[in-house]
């Protein structure tokens, strides 16, 4: 049957990538259809019940700054919040939250069902409709044909997914759900370059069977026994408009236990039946979230590993033991769980398993995540070789935006590595590809001092507003914050403190020593031991500003002060990094000719020519980041392009040098 209504964008898959893609495309005014195998699993957290972390929290904040759903859904469902790296610099601080799975799903579904211009439909997709080299729709398993101008594939682990428990294995997209075998076969027919990856999940435990007295309690921030008592963090920049931490449901602690030598002996006894070691699993697993058997094998000298016991939600006793992801046979899982302190009588509710699945080489994508071979077909999420909810959500928003922009006839949105972690993620994928599931870290961003969690809105919300992603409510909150930060920064720079008018004892109290000469408040705030609150208390509060008070700004006051303080204390570093950004931008403006025959660039080594021919970078900057391409090779390529006088290149080069 040909469905009578046509759409602009079809999104296939309703996990973290698909939901953000569909919401973004609809917010940009495109008629959007979200196809899913089950409406009951919209936004499902397939593995751990948490959002955020180092690098990952930065992506969540960026999705939020662009009007995405993940951060607000986490605030509405989060049962524990923590700021990681709190004692370190602002560039690497990150928010992490435990979420109630059911509340999170409900929050996502509510947003999907209430988004204008977005339709939901429950059916698996088995085929894509093509006209020449362009996708024009999707076909479901019962033959319903949906037509559209763009299709975004966010199939997660469902493409030819196979679950492994010991020597047993069966086809599945995740536990209890069928894999997308037909769609995977269709993509292989299109000769898109692909491979196999794997991920895994631990056995789930009934919390009533755990002896919590034998475990170490780990309270969240703001909880009794945690840091910042009474001040629970929030994820979304909009949370302040909805009551801040009052949005959160009841807060719960996590708990910690440990593996031991007996645990490790049990695990080793199952190596001969582990699909990892018998060769049953072809896919490569995530380096930074290894299975427990992989940890015991690789780190044989370690006698113990931490295991975090994380509650799955308020309405269930189910517990997620973070740290023992495994595909070992169930009898080994049973023994290894019961070998740990507090878990001696643990009842396993669900066995752990590994799942391997198809992914497609992201180097075959254009900069906007459109496939090079099929026009109008976009990929996002684990299909691109990434791991993690946050990486998926960010890619989904990016692909959904660019699919919608293409339908509108607008230029693609391509954030740079200096603008967003999303830009780093996209650039890493399309230039370097993946050999293992890709996970975001702050260390991947060379300009991370500019790409902090706290300023994601200052970097991206105006961009989102121009595209149409950001609604009036978010824009009003952002504008108040932005304007207050600008006003207060200028006031601090323009307000001077004269030592003749300040008693030495008062100067010593706030500044640590008497002032030698006149300083602006901004200069004083740059000192390591001076904070904003202390500075505003100087001389009886003489220099405090009502505009930045909690009475004036409400809950926004804290984030405004944070921005002002970071701008002052890191001014020198930020300016230096801006210079690095400007130097790096030179190569990013030099677009390589689409039809350039690298085989004719004889000054390059054969290897370099082969690598560039395979990758087809779009700019000289992208080319410089490809593995195996040296600075010398870039210089030789630049000389070739100059001598060849390629159309558009010389003018761009001249502009860049001017």
UniProtKB/Swiss-Prot annotation:
BP GO terms, sorted: tRNA methylation; tRNA wobble uridine modification
InterPro entries: FAD/NAD-bd_sf, GIDA_C_N, MnmG, MnmG-rel, MnmG-rel_CS, MnmG_C, MnmG_C_subdom, MnmG_C_subdom_sf
PROSITE patterns: GIDA_1, GIDA_2
Recorded superkingdom: Bacteria
Cofactor(s) listed: FAD
Keyword Chaperone: no
Compartments in which it is found: Cytoplasm
GO MF annotation, one: flavin adenine dinucleotide binding
Subunit-structure text: Homodimer. Heterotetramer of two MnmE and two MnmG subunits.
Family as reported in the entry's similarity comment: Belongs to the MnmG family.
Record function comment: NAD-binding protein involved in the addition of a carboxymethylaminomethyl (cmnm) group at the wobble position (U34) of certain tRNAs, forming tRNA-cmnm(5)s(2)U34.
Name assigned to this protein: tRNA uridine 5-carboxymethylaminomethyl modification enzyme MnmG
Native organism: Verminephrobacter eiseniae (strain EF01-2)
Originating gene: mnmG
